[in-house]
């Protein structure tokens, strides 16, 4: 019976059982998409990364699966994969090129094991200030009342900040609906309606809703975020790399900071799930005329570079038994 090594890796943390757990299958060549989906369901992590040999000059190829579907990109599973490969001496520190469903991404592994993932140039589509109707094709307007009801947050907490920070769809490869909230007490008490969030996600063609506040638990943090993605099988994601990069691009696009944009941002997330983690985000201008220009730029620059970074630690290392050809039973985990 065929076996495959399978890891559970906690990303955006240096401690086991914190951050965001990802499944990682470090040698996934030969697996079919159906087998990858079944393995992801068996491991039960919000996303599982399947590491394949690179194509067309790239170093690696990764496919990402939730327990229910394939997704084009997953930040925390990417960080988890490279941190695990580096810890096993399967990759060296330095720069690598990763192929994903959204294109080729630049990865940097630092000598201390920190992994940086450069994402696609961000695209930001501002929908409104939280109280007026949006331009989507939804039957019900996407205003503060509807968003507040879906998130289980007092709509006043959205209106209070919406005049300065609009609701928007932001993407660096995987789109998210970005919803600012005034204070952490409101974000922390969120009681989301999964069906309502799924409906909004489908209408806006996004993976989920990322709600954030500048009111943080730690003084060093830029913001506190929560990510809800029932449309892709994840009611709440503890720490979300793709959303963090997208929100970094959003913050620059809407001029969220007075003066110079910070050199590096620190996003805290997962505390209300007892899985605290921290995403480092770098957002910078690419010189005029560079490839990949995006409509994110509201500052006269032609393109924006976004990278997310963090650490990760292996919390489980085991073997997955695959059923023989023609056997419909699911595999089981052997520690």
What are these regions (language model features)?
Residues 32, 80, 219, 233-236, ...:
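Active-site environment of divalent metal-dependent phosphoester hydrolases
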Residues 2-70, 91:
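N-terminal lobe of the biotin/lipoate ligase/transferase fold
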Residues 46-61, 196-235, 264-289, 299-307:
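Conserved phosphate-donor
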Residues 287, 324-335:
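Non-transmembrane, aqueous-exposed alpha-helical and coiled segments at domain scale
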């Amino acid at each position: 019976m065929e076996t495959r090594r399978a890891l559970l890796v906690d990303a955006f943390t240096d401690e086991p059982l914190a951050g965001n757990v990802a499944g990682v299958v470090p040698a996934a060549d030969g697996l079919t998409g159906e087998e990858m989906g079944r393995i992801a369901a068996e491991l039960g992590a919000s996303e599982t990364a399947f590491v394949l040999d690179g194509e067309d000059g790239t170093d690696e190829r990764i496919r990402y699966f939730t327990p229910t579907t394939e997704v084009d990109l997953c930040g925390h599973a990417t960080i988890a994969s490279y941190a695990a490969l580096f810890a096993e001496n399967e990759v060296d520190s330095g720069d690598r090129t990763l192929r994903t469903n959204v294109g080729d991404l630049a990865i940097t592994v630092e000598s201390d094991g920190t992994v940086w993932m450069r994402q696609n140039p961000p695209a930001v589509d501002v929908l409104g200030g939280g109280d007026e109707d949006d331009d989507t094709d939804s039957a019900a307007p996407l205003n503060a009342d509807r968003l507040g009801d879906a998130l289980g947050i007092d709509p006043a907490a959205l209106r209070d900040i919406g005049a300065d920070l609009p609701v928007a769809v932001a993407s660096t490869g995987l789109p998210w609906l970005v919803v600012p909230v005034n204070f952490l007490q409101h974000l922390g008490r969120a009681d989301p309606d999964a069906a309502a969030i799924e409906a909004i996600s489908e209408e806006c063609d996004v993976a989920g809703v990322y709600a954030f506040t500048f009111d943080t638990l730690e003084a060093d943090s830029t913001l506190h975020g929560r990510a809800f993605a029932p449309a892709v099988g994840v009611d709440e994601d503890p720490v979300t790399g793709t959303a963090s990069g997208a929100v970094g691009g959003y913050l620059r696009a809407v001029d969220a900071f007075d003066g110079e944009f910070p050199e590096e941002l620190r996003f805290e997330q997962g505390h209300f799930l007892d899985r605290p983690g921290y995403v480092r985000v770098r957002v910078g201008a690419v010189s005029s005329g560079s490839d990949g220009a995006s409509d994110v730029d509201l500052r006269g620059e032609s393109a924006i570079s976004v990278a997310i970074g963090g650490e990760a630690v292996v919390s489980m290392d085991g073997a997955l038994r695959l059923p023989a050809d023609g056997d419909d039973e699911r595999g089981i985990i052997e520690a």
